[in-house]
Amino acid sequence: MRCIALAQAFVAKGVQVAFACSKQDGVIHVKSVGFDAIDLCSLSDRDQIAAISSQYRSDTLSLIIADSYEFSASYLEGLNNIAPTAYIDDLHTPELNISAIVNGNITADSSFYSKRYEQSSARLLIGPKYNILRSEFYGQKSIQIKDRVKRVLVTSGGSDPHGASIRITETLLECEPLYNAEIVVMAGPLSNSVSQLQSISANHPSVTVLQNASNVAELMRSCDMAIAAAGGTMNELCACGVPSVVYALANNQVRAAFSFSNKRCALDGGAVWDTDFSSRIKNCTEELAHSRDLRFIISNNANALFDGAGANRVATELLALATSADRSRV
């Protein structure tokens, strides 16, 4: 999703963009939104490098952006030998021989990158100001904070492997300040919880289940608060200034949930595998729903940290690295 958002930012600057995908679902998705894609699914790493080099000679390719946990240091260096390469790094990978590192996460440690890349000429784009969000989140202001919470959003991102959205929805139905509120569950395209959520909705008219929702920013802004996993959706909620309770769906989200809470951008509802997960979600939800002042503070902090302009900033910075004089192809 963030690669699509970044590609759209490049297109807005008059740059031609194409994709090279090593997963079949990636090829399908990229083509569905109107971009060309090279299918690398059946190729080894070495053959992938050769295919990219053959398809886009160095005199026609200005820049490469790589985004996958599976890329090795040698693979990224091979890409960098074709054209200046930027790596979107979530894992604080040390000492890559490439042209730029992008880490726009709330957990991004600028001091780590400064130390580990001290001897490198790589451009470092670190911190939430470089978080890549879809264009619909650009320039959003914080939502109006009402005296009472009337609409709550529940989301677990693209999937729901632990059935977190089910447990959270059942918990919210027991929260006293939400007795008269609408609960909107935004199920991701890979969620296996939809049928159970629809059963809950059938018995509780206050619960609405949406899957593959369009205009997500508008949906978020229609809600007074949210319960969200500590992934990309949480960054989008911050850009809209929606006060939230954040939770971890996976080990790599625990630190992010803590960081959102530590920066007073959300309340930390714990991890889905915690034995007290439901009670923590209930306590945090009631605390946030009861206090307009707390919601106001969290809303402003979140919106200030994620302003939705990260994709444009990253595109601008990376174009400065482009080798071709016209900087026309990424």
Where are each of the predicted segments found?
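Active-site and donor-binding regions of nucleotide-sugar-utilizing enzymes
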Residues: 2-11, 15, 19-119
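A nucleotide-sugar donor-handling region in carbohydrate enzymes
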Residues: 97-163, 194
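Donor-nucleotide binding loops and adjacent catalytic segments primarily
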Residues: 140-141, 146-223
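Conserved donor-binding/catalytic loop of nucleotide-activated donor transferases
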Residues: 221-224, 238-247
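Acidic donor-binding loop of glycosyltransferase active sites
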Residues: 221-233
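C-terminal "capping" alpha-helix adjacent to the active site of nucleotide-linked donor transferases
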Residues: 276-293
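A short, well-ordered alpha-helix in the C-terminal region of glycosyltransferases
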Residues: 287, 293-308
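C-terminal alpha-helical cap of glycosyltransferases
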Residues: 307-330
